[in-house]
C-alpha cells in the first residue's frame, strides 16, 4: 500500500504518460535510469503500473491524488529552481521550453545566461487554448505566471514562469525535456547575439546543422 509514497515513486506516477519507456520517464524527471527502473519494477509488482507496449498507469485517480499531495507539500516547502523545471511534466499538457531556456536545453545545460537565483524566470511555449489552465496549474504551487517577465519587486518568491502562447507547438526532446526546434533556438540566439555568442559557438560544435556565420544583429534586451 505504501509503495507510491516515496519521492521518486510519486514523481514517476505524476510524470508517466501512456507508452513511456523507463529511460523516457527517468529523463523527464531528471533521475538516474537504473534508479527509476527499480522504482518502476516495484510499482509494477504492487499493481500500480503495467507494461503493454510501453508503461501505463493502472488508475489515473492515483495521479490526481499525487498531484494534490504535491500541491499541499508546496505550501510548506516551495519548489526549488531544479524542481520547477520538472513541474511542467506533471501538468498533463503539451509545452516546450523556449527563449533562453531553449538555449539552456539545447546546450544540455552547458550555457546558462545570467539569471539571479533570487529572480529566476522560466520560459515555456504553450498552446493558446491552454493558457488559463497553465496559469491555474502554477497557481497551485504559488508560482506567478505572465506573458512577459514580471519585475522582481512585484513578486513574493524568486521563481516565475513566462508563458508564451502559440496556436501550435512544434517540440523536440533533449534529455527528456520538450523544447522548441534547434533552428528556432539558433534564430533566437542570433537575434540576441550579444547575450548568446558563446552559446552559438557551443551549439555550432554540438550540432552540424547550426550555422553561426550569419551577420548578427546585437541587441540589448532584458529577458
Please tell me what each predicted stretch does:
Residues 1-9, 54-75:
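Short, cationic-aromatic polyanion-contact patches
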Residues 7-8, 20, 181:
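Alpha-helix N-cap/N′ positions at the starts of helices
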Residues 8-12, 16:
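Short alpha-helical "packing" element that flanks the helix-turn-helix/winged-helix DNA-binding module
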Residues 16-29:
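Short acidic, hydrophobic short linear motifs in intrinsically disordered regions
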Residues 30-45:
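Short amphipathic alpha-helical interaction segments
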Residues 44-54:
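A short, conserved structural fragment
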Residues 73-138:
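Active-site nucleotide-donor binding segment shared across nucleotidyl transfer reactions
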Residues 111-223:
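Phosphate-handling catalytic interfaces
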